[in-house]
Amino acid sequence: MWQLLLFNVTNGLIIGAFYVLMALGLSLILNLSNVINFAHGGFLVIGGYIAYTITPYIGFWGALLLAPPLTAIIGLLVERVLIRPLYGRDPLYSLLLTFGLAFMIEDGTRFIWGPQGKPVTIPAFLAQPLSNDLFFITGYRLFMVAVVMVAVTLLFLLLRYTRLGIRIRAGTLDLETVAALGINVQMLRSLNFAVGIFLAGLSGVLAAGQLGLEPTMGTGLLMPSFIAIIVGGIGSLPGTLVGGLLIGVASGLTAVFLPAASEAVIYVMMAVVLLLRPRGLFGEEGMMS
């Protein structure tokens, strides 16, 4: 029993780590640009397939370093051509656009790489379990959690101590004032969008190494990532971090005692949080609250 419990809690933490990376990218874009990016899961898929394509040439480590920035560059192009013209308009326009874009990415990856699942080869030593008793905890699972921790730490350092991060935080509070100070708001939005898509691409590489690839894999991570933002509090990146981990662990624990409700529990959690705290657990004005 204890092994089953430990397995599901560990699995929940790992899934929660994916939710955190995805949700932080979504939250960055939403907070500054007021864009609900339904194509975020599609960019995760793009990152994974880029890693799959280049791994035979530069290895897994090279793909891990190269695929996320390449995904961010693709995101920049999409933002410049499709999303930027919709800034300042009703958010429904960008929501519908990214919703359609998600289907375009899914069909595009299916056309280029085929509908069959694709494996991404990871280093052999990462595929080994830690011990016979903890056979379900492989080195790669711990590696994924470590990468997420490093990425989240670097993101918060960027937002707290760099000029770009300070401008992003200021723009979240009052974009008009930032523009009045002579800061290029369009460039700020673009760079912020690229950071968010970078996180999606990184999530895709990590997920591909664990789960393999298929064109629809981003869809399964997208809605829980939105729920993580809502539970943690819209506008709060620390809240998004906590929300992602909470729903991951809750899903894992529920799988032990009530397997049929393991997916539904995150929606129940969202409903309870909204009833008790409509702004979420940490929701306040401003993204670093």
Language model feature labels by segment:
Residues 2-18, 158-163, 189-231, 251-264:
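Inter-helical junctions in multi-pass inner-membrane proteins, predominant
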Residues 10, 85-86, 91-161, 188-191, ...:
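Transmembrane helix-bundle core of multi-pass membrane transporters
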Residues 26-48, 88-93, 164-167, 190-191, ...:
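Short, non-helical or kinked segments that cap or interrupt transmembrane helices
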Residues 31-39, 73-116, 158-165, 170, ...:
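Short loop segments and helix-boundary regions at transmembrane helix junctions
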Residues 32-77, 81:
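Membrane-embedded helix boundary and interhelical linker motif in transport proteins
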Residues 81, 112, 172-180, 184-187, ...:
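Cytosolic-side transmembrane-helix boundaries in multi-pass membrane proteins
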